[in-house]
């Protein structure tokens, strides 16, 4: 069993949230954005290195810098016929 701790004080609540937030140890060398995982940093840094590489949607013609964004767009926006 475990107990649930109730925090009534606003100062304590914000302090608790700050301590429970994961540390952002991986920093982008281009814009100083912080990440908790090295993989996320690597994906982000690609946007700085190669802006000329784009992926386009065959249905609507929109362009995306990341392949994952195109895949997400296909699933949620465009209707495949």
From Swiss-Prot:
Organism: Drosophila melanogaster
Domains: entry comment: The C2H2-type domain 1 is essential for binding to and repressing lin, while the C2H2-type domain 2 contributes to lin binding.
GO BP, sorted A to Z: digestive tract development; embryonic foregut morphogenesis; embryonic hindgut morphogenesis; embryonic pattern specification; foregut morphogenesis; hindgut morphogenesis; imaginal disc-derived leg joint morphogenesis; negative regulation of DNA-templated transcription
Encoding gene, per UniProt annotation: drm
Effect of residue 25 to K: In drm5; foregut proventriculus morphologically and functionally defective
UniProt KW Zinc-finger keyword: yes
Chief place of localization: nucleus
Compartment annotation: Nucleus
InterPro entries: C2H2-ZF_Transcription_Reg, Znf_C2H2_sf, Znf_C2H2_type
Subunit organization: Interacts with lin.
Tissues expressing this chain: Has two temporally distinct modes of expression during early embryogenesis. Expressed in seven stripes at the blastoderm stage, then during gastrulation the seven primary stripes are supplemented by seven secondary stripes which appear in alternate segments. This results in the labelling of each of the 14 segments in the extended germ band. Also expressed in the anterior gut primordium starting at stage 5 and in the embryonic foregut (including the proventriculus) and hindgut.
Keywords of the record: Developmental protein, DNA-binding, Metal-binding, Nucleus, Pair-rule protein, Repeat, Transcription, Transcription regulation, Zinc, Zinc-finger
Name of the protein: Protein drumstick
Entries under SUPFAM superfamilies matching the protein: beta-beta-alpha zinc fingers (SSF57667)
Function, in words: Putative transcription factor. May function redundantly with odd and sob in leg joint formation during the larval stages, acting downstream of Notch activation. Acts in a hierarchy during foregut and hindgut patterning and morphogenesis, antagonizing lin to relieve the repressive effect on bowl. Involved in cell rearrangement during elongation of the embryonic hindgut. Regulates expression of hindgut patterning genes to establish the small intestine region of the embryonic hindgut. Required in the foregut for spatially localized gene expression and morphogenesis of the proventriculus.
Renumbered zinc finger spans (C2H2-type): 26-48, 55-75
Annotated GO MF terms: DNA binding; zinc ion binding
Annotated effect of mutating residue 57 to G: Reduces lin binding. No effect on lin-inhibiting activity
GO cellular component, one term: nucleus
